[in-house]
Amino acid sequence: MDLEFFNRILSVDSTSGKEGGLADMLSAEFAASGRKVELFEVGDGTKNLLVSWGTPKLVFCTHLDTVPPYIPCHSERCSGSDASDMAFCGRGTCDAKGQIFAMWEACKALEAQGCTDFGLLLLAGEETGSFGAKAFRDQHPGAEWVVVGEPTDNCMASAAKGTKSFEVAFEGKAFHSGYPENGISAVELFNDFMSALRSIRFPKDELLGETTFNVGKLVSDNPQNILSDSLTCRVYFRTTFESDEMVCNVMKNMAGPEAKLRFGRPRVQDGSDIVAKDVAQWQKAMTVKAFGGDAPTRFETLPGFETKPVSFGSDAPQLNNFAHKILCGPGSILVAHRPEEHILLSDLKQAVANYVRIYKTLMN
C-alpha cells in the first residue's frame, strides 16, 4: 500500500467548502497515469471527480469534504495485542479519506489484474447537504452499481436511518425577570415543547430501532435579567421506516393556534396523562419550518459479508442514477467527527480486499 500517498491526502485541509483543493490534487495524480479523469462543477465552487476504467458498470464512491475543524494528521504504532498495527489519527482519517485511499488501492489492484468497467467517484459537499451527489445525479447517467464508502467497520450496511430537519421558533413577551408573571418567556415555551416532544412514543422499527432527535443552533439572545421574547432552534430527527412519515405529521400538527395535536400534563398520583382539550400556550407561540431530509434507505448486501443497520446519513439516498447501492467502508462512525478520529492500517487493508471482492462477485 502506498502509505506516503495516504499521508499526502491527509495533509490537505478539505473541510467543507475547501475540498476543491483535494479534488485538484487527486485529479492531477490520477491523470498522470493516463487514466480517464473528469471534473464536474457542482455550482458552489466545489468539484466532483470521476476516474473511469472502460465504461463503468460499478462505481466506488465516497466524499472529499470533512467536518471542521481541520486536525493535522499523524500516525502511531498501536500498543498491546495490536502492536503490529498502525493508527492514522486526525480529521478525515475515517470519514472519509480512509475510504478514498482504500477505494483507490482497490482500483489499482483491479487494474493490475486486467479488470475494467469500473470507476472511482469522489463527491463534494456530503457533510453539508450532499450537494455534490445531487449535482452528479443530474449531470451523469450513473451505472448499475454504486459502492458508497462510509465508516461501517467494514460491514455492509443493511439499512440506514433517514433524516428530517425542522426550524422551530417561539415568540414570547419580554419583561423584567423579577416579575415573570407579567411576561412570557420563550425559553419556558421551548421547555414545554421539549417535554411534549419527549412524551411522543414513535414506533420502534424492527431493523433500525428507535427514532431519535437532536437540538442545534439554539438561539435566545436575551439578557439574563429579561424574559426571552424569542427563541429559535433546529430539531434534527433520525427516522426509521416506521416513523419517517409520522415525524413529519407530528411536527406539522403540533404548532400554531389551530394545532391538531393536544398535549396534557401527568397525573401526580399514577403518572398517567391528562389530555388537554385546548391548544397549549407554547403551541400557539410556536412556528415550524420543514427543511426536508432523506428517507430511510435499504441497501444491497452480499453473501459472506457481515451486515448491520446504521444510524448515520450519506450521499447514497441522493444517488438515484444508480440502480443498486451498497454501503460499506473501513473505520468506525463512533470516532468520526471527534478529536480522536482515527483509522487502523489493518482496517484499510481489509477494505481494499472487500472492495476487490465486491467487484469480482458482481461483475464476474
Predicted regions and their residues:
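Short, conserved micro-motifs enriched in small and acidic residues
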Residues: F88-F101, E127, I184-V187, H342-L345, ...
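Intrinsic disorder/low-complexity segments
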Residues: H74-A87, A112-C115, K277-M286, A295-T297
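Short glycine-aspartate micro-motif
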Residues: V59, F88, E144-V148, S165-E167, ...
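Metal-dependent amide/peptide-bond hydrolase catalytic core
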Residues: S14-K18, E38, P151, S158-A159, ...
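Glycine/serine-rich anion-binding loops at beta->alpha junctions
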Residues: P68, A87-A102, H176, I326-C328
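Acidic/histidine-rich catalytic neighborhood of metal-dependent amide-processing enzymes
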Residues: K97-S165, D205
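Acidic/His- and Gly-rich active-site-bordering loop/insert found
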Residues: M1-T93
